[in-house]
């Protein structure tokens, strides 16, 4: 919902995308309609319409994507680092382009960041069960799409930690809306806040991870190694629905490369659920106890990839 007494806060919102402009525009609509807006929104993106970007009452800084690879692949970690380097504020909130922010997300997460300035804080996602209609996207841009509608259209991911719905209304009792955790594997870079000093201390996202998988877990493991506290919060975002593959065999190559990179660095296997599924499909030979690099045994056929495609799934 739009707010008459909207605040502007000294925080930079950073997002990056390619080929997902409908989601990007919805994200910008939600930011513009929130109770408080960031003083700048940094978009690492090459293909969005500058005239459309100019239509939002936000200070938007668009910077071009760059890739660490020579083949021009979209490297989300590298692009997040570019966004952080371009940020004018010390406080930074990173959002996947799939996000819509709740009315008070920016205001509440920023306030919590100011009270925990040396920590890593992550928000709470809900998952839309279908894409927004054109009418709903228009209402969102007009500040007329109620959060009750987004709550009705969304669900929680039962495989991740979730706050109860009651906790969303208990911002005044902060003990119920923020939890210090040692489970750094629960970190997901969909929606998180961090100050520049801690981001630099971590080293940003490791750009040795190419393509899909493990770069956010690596980021969290480095935070843990450095003693940076990690908080889960009930600050709410809505993940816009898009098709997925179950299992993610369309990303087999990059998942294996990144899993090997992660194990070499941390002596721990990330993405064990996916690796287990790949092993059951005889695509790889892998067990949680192994210490040797994973090798691809079989490549999925196009028919296999199409069979794994789930166009209506809310999450992987």
Task: Describe each model-derived feature in a short phrase.
Residues 231-249, 262:
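Active-site donor/metal-binding and catalytic loop motifs
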Residues 1-30:
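N-proximal low-complexity "stem/linker" segments adjacent to membrane-targeting elements
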Residues 142-184:
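Short, flexible, basic/aromatic active-site loop/helix in glycosyltransferases
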Residues 29-38:
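Short, acidic, metal-binding catalytic loop of nucleotide-sugar glycosyltransferases
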Residues 92:
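Short aromatic/hydrophobic "clamp" motif used to bind/position activated sugar donors
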Residues 200, 207-210, 220-238:
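Catalytic donor-sugar/metal-binding loop of nucleotide-sugar-dependent glycosyltransferases
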Residues 104-150:
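Conserved donor NDP-sugar-binding/catalytic core segment of glycosyltransferases
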Residues 69-87:
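Glycine-rich, basic loop-to-helix element that forms the pyrophosphate-binding segment
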């Amino acid at each position: 919902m739009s707010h008459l007494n909207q605040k502007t806060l000294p925080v930079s919102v950073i997002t990056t995308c390619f080929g997902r402009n409908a989601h990007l525009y919805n994200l910008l609509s939600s930011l513009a309609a929130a109770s408080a807006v960031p003083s700048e929104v940094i978009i690492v993106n090459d293909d969005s319409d500058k005239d459309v970007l100019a239509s939002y009452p936000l200070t938007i800084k668009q910077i071009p994507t760059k890739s660490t690879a020579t083949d021009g692949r979209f490297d989300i970690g590298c692009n997040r680092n570019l966004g952080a380097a371009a940020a004018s504020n010390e406080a930074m909130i990173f959002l996947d382009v799939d996000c819509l922010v709740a009315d008070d997300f920016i205001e509440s997460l920023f306030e919590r960041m100011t009270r925990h300035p040396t920590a890593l804080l992550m928000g709470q996602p809900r998952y839309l069960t279908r894409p927004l209609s054109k009418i709903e996207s228009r209402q969102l841009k007009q500040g007329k799409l109620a959060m009750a509608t987004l709550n009705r259209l969304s669900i929680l991911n039962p495989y991740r930690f979730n706050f109860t719905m009651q906790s969303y209304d208990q911002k005044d009792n902060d003990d119920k809306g923020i939890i210090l955790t040692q489970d750094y594997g629960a970190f997901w870079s969909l929606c998180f806040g961090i100050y520049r000093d801690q981001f630099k201390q971590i080293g940003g996202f490791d750009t040795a991870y190419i393509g899909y998988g493990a770069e956010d877990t690596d980021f969290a493991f480095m935070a843990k190694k450095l003693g940076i506290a990690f908080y889960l919060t009930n600050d709410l975002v809505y993940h816009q629905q898009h098709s997925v593959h179950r299992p993610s065999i369309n990303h087999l190559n990059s998942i294996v490369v990144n899993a090997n990179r992660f194990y070499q660095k941390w002596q721990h296997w990330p993405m064990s659920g996916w690796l287990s599924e790949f092993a059951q499909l005889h695509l790889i030979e892998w067990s949680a106890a192994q210490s040797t690099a994973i090798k691809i045994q079989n490549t999925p056929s196009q028919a296999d990839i199409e069979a794994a495609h789930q166009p209506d799934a809310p999450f992987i």
